[in-house]
């Protein structure tokens, strides 16, 4: 058993038989009273997010999670097929486990899969990916002076908000955690 001093972003803890990933944590030492740790946890199976507070020094059960490099191969119905880059074994991961990561995955892209006792928990992507805009309305001449945005569909089928001056065929960098446009990529 570990203590609250060992809490870090990304670790997985076991609470009442369910696995929770730490999204955020903050050690708080108020002027009056004892210190405590405020956490934001995400259930790795259901995706539910909760806030939980622990007294400083409380015991927690940190679960060992094996993170392995995989390559995304293709989508098979609602499932996604990945190949282990070390031994070339293929695994099929159901869509609900892949979750929102599917919006940003391209074929042959390297990802990290978190495994617990051989079962996939979730798919981790890089912080940002480069995607090509496959469709967006043309920007009007007078719209360039304003700081507005317009919807654009990227090659995975996901829709993002982009500045008005971008056109179909432009490559853009997208934040995989929020889905926000980060910038244009020049080839």
Curated annotation (Swiss-Prot):
This is Elongation factor P. InterPro entries: Elong-fact-P_C, NA-bd_OB-fold, Rib_uL2_dom2, Transl_elong_fac_P/YeiP, Transl_elong_KOW-like, Transl_elong_P/YeiP_cen, Transl_elong_P/YeiP_CS, Transl_elongation_fac_P. One of its GO terms (biological process) is peptide biosynthetic process. Gene3D superfamilies: 2.30.30.30, Nucleic acid-binding proteins (2.40.50.140). Involved in peptide bond synthesis. Stimulates efficient translation and peptide-bond synthesis on native or reconstituted 70S ribosomes in vitro. Probably functions indirectly by altering the affinity of the ribosome for aminoacyl-tRNA, thus increasing their reactivity as acceptors for peptidyl transferase. Belongs to the elongation factor P family. The keyword Membrane does not apply. It holds the Pfam family EFP_N. It comes from Leifsonia xyli subsp. xyli (strain CTCB07). GO terms for molecular function: translation elongation factor activity.
